[in-house]
Amino acid sequence: MNKLKKEYLFFKQQEPNMRTLLVTNMLYALVLPIVEIFVGAYIMRNTSDPVMVAFYQLAMYIGIITTSLVNGYLLKKYSVKTLYSVGILVSGISMFGMMTIKSLGFIELGLAGFLMGAASGFFWTNRYLLALYNTNDNSRNYFFGLESFFFSITSIGVPLIIGAFISQIDGKEVFGFLFNINTS
């Protein structure tokens, strides 16, 4: 427990902007596996076709590459903080849009995947730039090490917790609603 306290005190010694960026990225790391699980499950539930999931992923990667390239031009006009925030907001808008579509076809999935990729592209490219601005040579390894550690832990732990929760709630009634993972 003493080591955790030392680590926390060291974290508190860092620049406020760096701490804020780390906390924001850690919260995003908690949400990211949920989003990825939800989107894949949502597409499979509505299409029953793994090809559609692969197509969505392909569109997402095209969106990441495209916005990573466009981001350089946008930085001439908008602040890095604005583009970083846009990346986070567009991911939520993309998921909401995908959920409101009545039928998921190639065009709808392509557009939703591209928007989710655009959100990721804006988030990651600007996150790296913010990390560069808010760290120095002495704190950069600490920043990326702590962030990588947290992303690794959440990428493994969150899906395990979600799976355990789903398996435990299956077949139970909560507030008059029967949870059955085998029915839609």
Question: What residues fall within each predicted segment?
Answer:
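Glycine-rich segments within core transmembrane alpha-helices of 12-TM secondary carriers
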Residues: 144-163
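Transmembrane alpha-helix termini and helix-breaking/packing motifs in multi-pass membrane transporters
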Residues: 41, 73, 157-179
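Helix-to-loop junctions at the C-terminal end of transmembrane segments
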Residues: 67-80, 166
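Intracellular juxtamembrane helix-capping segments at the cytosolic ends
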Residues: 122-135
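C-terminal ends and interior cores of transmembrane alpha-helices
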Residues: 89-104
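Hydrophobic core of transmembrane alpha-helices in multi-pass small-molecule transporters
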Residues: 26, 105-123
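Helix-loop boundary and gating motifs at the non-cytosolic
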Residues: 3-64
